[in-house]
């Protein structure tokens, strides 16, 4: 015969003398600490919970005097129950507002709402329209970049505050080393909190699990970009211009579809290049800013980041100003002549076929002339030898010409005839001026 346990009036409602009612505990817990659970991730009013240990600790503090064994397992079970009770549909992707520590900034009219709502990302900085201008930050940027490139950076950092890929760009800041360019990334981590993560562009492209780390992020910072050329670029290009859900993988978990809106901000001593992709699509996705040389007599300030982070509220206003300008310009970035030339220079350095096609003395464009693919490739190899360049393969050389035939007014043909009646491939519109020895 079961012995009835008299209820102690001091016991919480979810404890019945021998066991804890997990559902009742979960409801009481959510009343005290509101949470939502989306796709297995818990959210507080501050945004996604990156580490559940704090929540587990709160559960432990509530139940430890009522559990005599299996405490760890009980805490885990209750946490899973809370996730079920806190289930919520995904938050809408809000591209017209920025959730901040003290409220919501509305982009269309620049108004501010002093209320904290559940959201996908909340930046750990307060909105203060009267915050002073971030003079130390601005001085640092003027010492680091050409003045014409600062508006581009301002617009891009503002762009990273909202979950949008409409700008369809990634940013690279390139220097010789020691200029302090990576300080920008450290300040952004303080400005954006967990909405920004550190990572590697190479890893995102080459490691199938790394792309899942971009979920829920506004920005990924690569503060020391690997200079090795990418063997492929399809994932990077897709993420930069993402307009639909992407397939993500985590170890031991079935792949799933999610919206990814993370932007890339990369710092390095050289630009991002590809072994095989030399298309306009790869290069037009890049904004490349080059730094000024480090003054020989400059003494580095070890407290520079702390000084700039003291201006976070002013830096936020500066970024919002850039975001407004970008939106008003239909997400077309301000690009200086220098920045545009940077992209062209990198494109040429990774594809010397462009320089060859603009060379003199080896061939000329003439509508009523034609040349076989092999003869034209031999002329190109001669140009490479004369200019101490590595030649690309014959297949890639012909492919580059076919992709740019309109640019050079060429016509691809299969009707080039050699002595003996042999018919080969070639191009109409080229007159050879040199004839390399076979």
Feature names for model-found ranges:
Residues 1-38, 64-438:
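Feature primarily recognizes SF3-like P-loop helicase cores of small DNA viruses
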Residues 1-3, 38-66:
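Modules that initiate DNA replication and primer synthesis
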